[in-house]
């Protein structure tokens, strides 16, 4: 019922939206993990809900600062959770497609690159659906843009801390090498990569 309510823009319960977001994103994570298989399926199924909902939890206070003039805290949380919930549901709907490619793709550098492109496209499509719903709720381009920037800024670092998502080899199925992930951050990595292109 919650998924149906999300799709039809009805008012689902907070518990229902949390459950739908967790279940849908877990399905997507499991599909991603099936590229390497084995424990990576379970790892990614656990990490994907932590990523989406954890990013929301960390971002919420900053989001409400921008929305406090127009929305109460409960309304801010409801709009943000609905956005994340719909994004997760779309990701869940794309899980069979992602699983088909993940399970049949050879574990190689070429297969890895193709899968990363597929995952990027899938997450982008889900994100567009979520942002469209967010804008229809907020009815403010500036507030929508601010929320998206806050969530993406936080989410990029969350994704870095929770990596690996797609393992390079069948032997690389670690759950969370946190000590290694704490060395540097997403933005430092991007800058280093860009500078490396010109050195």
Which residue ranges define each predicted feature?
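N-terminal juxtamembrane cytosolic/stromal segments of multi-pass membrane proteins
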Residues: 1-18, 23, 178-199
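A contiguous pocket-lining binding segment that forms or flanks enzyme active sites
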Residues: 95-144
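Hydrophobic alpha-helical transmembrane segments of multi-pass integral membrane proteins
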Residues: 18-30, 50-58, 85-98, 119-129, ...
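Alpha-helical transmembrane segments and their helix-start/interface "positive-inside/aromatic belt" motifs
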Residues: 8-19, 41-44, 141-153
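Structural signal for the C-terminal ends of transmembrane alpha-helices
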Residues: 34, 65-67, 135
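Alpha-helical transmembrane segments with an aromatic anchor "belt"
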Residues: 39-114
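Short, hydrophobic transmembrane alpha-helix segments
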Residues: 30-41
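C-terminal membrane-adjacent module
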Residues: 137-199
């Amino acid at each position: 019922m919650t998924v149906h309510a999300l799709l039809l823009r009805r008012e689902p319960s907070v518990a229902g939206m949390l459950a739908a977001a967790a279940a849908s994103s877990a399905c997507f994570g499991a599909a991603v993990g099936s590229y390497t298989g084995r424990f990576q399926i379970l790892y990614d199924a656990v990490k994907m809900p932590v990523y989406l909902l954890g990013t929301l939890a960390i971002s919420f206070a900053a989001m409400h600062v921008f929305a406090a003039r127009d929305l109460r805290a409960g309304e801010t949380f409801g709009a943000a959770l609905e956005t994340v919930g719909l994004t997760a549901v779309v990701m869940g709907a794309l899980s069979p497609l992602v699983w088909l490619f993940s399970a049949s793709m050879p574990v190689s550098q070429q297969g890895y690159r193709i899968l990363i492109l597929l995952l990027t496209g899938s997450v982008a499509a889900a994100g567009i659906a979520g942002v469209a719903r967010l804008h229809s709720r907020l009815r403010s381009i500036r507030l929508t843009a601010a929320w998206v920037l806050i969530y993406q800024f936080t989410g990029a670092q969350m994704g870095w801390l929770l990596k690996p998502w797609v393992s390079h080899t069948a032997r690389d199925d670690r759950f969370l090498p946190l000590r290694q992930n704490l060395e540097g951050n997403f933005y430092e990595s991007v800058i280093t990569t860009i500078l490396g292109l010109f050195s």
